From Swiss-Prot:
The chain crosses the membrane at residues 420-440. The gene is erg9. It comes from Aspergillus fumigatus (strain ATCC MYA-4609 / CBS 101355 / FGSC A1100 / Af293). This is Squalene synthase erg9. The keyword Methyltransferase does not apply. Pathway: Steroid metabolism; ergosterol biosynthesis.
Length: 471
């Protein structure tokens, strides 16, 4: 949207504007990156981090200094791998050995790759990959070992997928294949990140023993993206929804995008959402095992965005027409909720689980299972943070408000006050700008008296001889 369209939108959605302003003005990072002590190659790495992903760049750059550079190098290494895998112009005989041997290039001084097509988005990262290698070699041995191990696993997984796509069919057939694909492209990131957290003593070592927890962290994000991007992927000739699911609802995958099959398509998307929701409980469990605030923020923000995106996509026909995203104001509100504490984050999850449950319909073949999945999220949160204690029950009987309820009422009153203030301020701005524009028009000779006479006659358009006159 343009500036004028944005201004018009936020006049009618002031609460979203308030969330954006709160995040932009009052958000204080737990840690701030200190560029004064960085080498030139490190600065180049952070430049590429900004170019490859603004969202991940923002959360990575707020990490504890101990993990700041290791996580940046980890992300750029996997992004380089992904850039090779995504480029369909690279033949399999070149791509496969590159992917399988990418872990080894991390030890080769000066290595780079110029074989990507010119339009490839992150081509320049690989052209200047020697900067990443230089900084990789300066990391602690334990961090280097984690990055190399995950790079090897992901490279082999991507190579297997590329070979299958070239020799057979790139589409995903079974739910098991779907989970395996998501594991290679996202679950391994969860494993690597967890190992880095534990190595830095910012995560509970027990997280490494519960592989299903960090696996779910990655799969929940990846599956949400696959659900949201179904139209975009289809237009690009890619198909990630497993045939085992969509074949229950339509004959051919492309039938999902036909208007006459809309109800079947919605039921299919509901089953995809259900498949993703089953990871939510384990994600919440994982987040409880993080010990450092910036690491918690790093993990919590994407997860809260994912549950909000699932709620947006659930039984929403728009996903079969275009790529949809949560609103910017809602995203800012979620980021504020995800950077405070576990209880507030869990409440955000509870809110969106209830939204999904509310939109659920008995017409959906998965109605019961979706209800159970939402209830499991509620039950888990209630187990960790009970909503009612004996003291709370007694207070309710007496009609007294708890401190939390009083604080919530105060914040709601403050929000209403802020919203009214912003609406009044925007009204004043509109009036002021209108007066200034009218004043300028009058100063430069505008005849408002003649315009008024024409309006009184019922003429709301200029005379025909003026409209048709050539300038």
């Amino acid at each position: 949207m343009g500036v004028a369209a944005n201004a018009f939108y936020y006049i009618f959605h002031p609460s979203e504007l308030r969330s954006i302003l709160q995040w932009k003005i009052w958000h204080n990072p737990v840690h701030e990156r200190d560029e004064s002590n960085e080498s030139e190659t490190a600065k180049t790495c952070f430049k590429f981090l900004d170019l490859t992903s603004r969202s991940f760049s923002a959360v990575i750059k707020e990490l504890h200094p101990e993990l700041l550079l290791p996580m940046c190098i980890f992300y750029l290494t996997l992004r380089g791998l992904d850039t090779i895998e995504d480029d369909t112009s690279i033949p399999l005989e070149t791509k496969e050995p590159l992917l399988r041997g990418f872990k080894d290039v991390l030890e080769q001084d000066g290595w780079n790759f110029t074989g990507n097509r010119p339009e490839e988005k992150d081509r320049e990262l690989l052209v200047q990959f020697h900067n990443v290698i230089t900084e990789f070699k300066r990391l602690k041995p334990a961090y280097k070992a984690v990055i190399k191990d995950i790079t090897e696993k992901m490279g082999n997984g991507m190579a297997d997928y590329c070979r299958k796509a070239a020799l057979d069919d790139a589409s995903v057939k079974t739910v098991e294949e779907y989970d395996l694909y998501c594991w290679y492209v996202a679950g391994l990131v969860g494993e690597g990140s967890t190992r880095l957290f534990v190595e830095a003593e910012f995560g509970n070592p027990a997280l490494l023993k519960r592989t299903e927890l960090y696996k779910s962290m990655g799969l929940f994000l990846q599956k949400t993206n696959i659900i949201r991007d179904v139209r975009e992927d289809f237009d690009d000739g890619r198909q990630f929804w497993p045939k085992e699911i969509w074949s229950k609802h339509v004959t051919n995958f492309e039938d999902l995008f036909k208007p006459e099959n809309r109800e079947a398509a919605l039921n299919c998307s509901s089953e995809m959402v259900l498949n993703a929701l089953r990871h939510a409980e384990e994600c919440l469990f994982y987040l409880a095992g993080l010990r450092e605030q910036s690491v918690f923020n790093f993990c919590a923000i994407p997860q809260s965005m994912a549950i909000a995106t699932l709620s947006l996509c659930f039984r929403n026909p728009a996903i079969f027409e275009r790529n949809i995203k949560i609103k910017k104001g809602e995203a800012c509100q979620l980021m504020m909720e995800s950077t405070q504490n576990l209880r507030i984050l869990y409440e955000a999850f509870r809110r969106y689980a209830r939204e999904i449950h509310k939109k659920n319909t008995p017409k959906d073949p998965n109605f019961l299972e979706i209800g159970i999945a939402c209830a499991k999220i509620e039950k888990f949160i209630e187990t960790i943070f009970p909503s009612q204690s004996a003291e709370e029950a007694n207070r309710r009987v007496l009609g007294q408000k708890s401190e939390a309820e009083q604080e919530k009422a105060r914040l709601e009153a403050e929000t209403r006050k802020d919203v009214l203030f912003m609406m009044a301020l925007m009204g004043v701005i509109v009036v002021f700008v209108s007066i200034v524009m009218i004043g300028f028009a009058w100063y430069f000779g505008a005849r408002f008296d003649l315009a008024w006479q024409e309006l009184r006659k019922g003429n709301f358009r200029p005379p025909k001889h003026l409209r048709d006159r050539e300038l």
